[in-house]
Amino acid sequence: MTDFYIPPKEISFRLLGYVSQYVLVSRTHNDPQVFHHPKDSENPDQYFQLIPGTGQHAGYYLIKSKYTGKVLFSRLSPSPRVGHIDGSGQYGDNWFQVEVGKGQYTQNFRLRNFASDTVLFSRTHANPQVYNHPASDSNPDQYFTFLFEDMKVDKVEYHLNLGKILSSIPIIIANQTLQNDSSIDQEMAFELDVTETHTSTFEYTTGFTITYGATFKAGVPLVAEAEFKVDTSLSQEWKFGTMTEFGKSYVAKLPVKAPPHTTVRAVSSVNRGDIEVPFTIYLSSKATGFQVQTHGIFRGVSTWDLRHTVSTQDLK
């Protein structure tokens, strides 16, 4: 179960239409002044902030443009029904609820107005393209999502004390034999150099929503001597929300001696299983340095606990 993240007023964002794939703009140099634009052409007039309300407007927000300083409104009359205005929310039609969707829209929301009980929409197939509609009628073009400003990952903290081994089975990674048919001792070194493939992913649960596929670097949680530790030597580039593969190498050298007419066998094995470790990712705005947190679960298929069994058997 995940909670929908509503950003604090210090974090800016673009509002992306679910159907249009355009982002809203607030401008004064062209009409209509509140309109939309293709998301791939990024401009300062596309960024907004949410200012939370109090009192009768608790649970509602001003949608304030970082570019013009104006706040959006949605009303039934007069024209224009959708636009922006100076001020700090003195009118009821300046306040919006972030109404989270259901089903296929669980990662999206409608912007529902306090006074007019209308919702904004963004479409390209008909005019008007950016307008409002009664909230009682739900349509796909009424849904939006946040595209947040550029953030950087400051650190990844694994909560190792809460890590879990969900499954574990032993696997053999090497099986070596020295057979001595002679009448004198024979010595050699069994050498192990094996790389096991690990897979893992970072799954979001709460907090700031990192863009799917966003890249960052972090160490790898692993099991060592029945405890979880972080291996910084395996610092890996991850893509958030996607499966990542990386290798863990096992290297060892075992001197063995085989007495006359014996066989010496060395078996090297590890445990392989599923693990999960809760994490917190600390991020900050590249523009302002304001810090936010993302919480989730690191899930992976891992190996651990390298061990060797050496046995001697007489030849018959």
Task: Please name every model-derived segment.
Residues 149-316:
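Membrane-permeabilization and membrane-interfacing ectodomains
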Residues 1-155:
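Lectin-like carbohydrate-binding module/patch detector with strong preference for beta-trefoil
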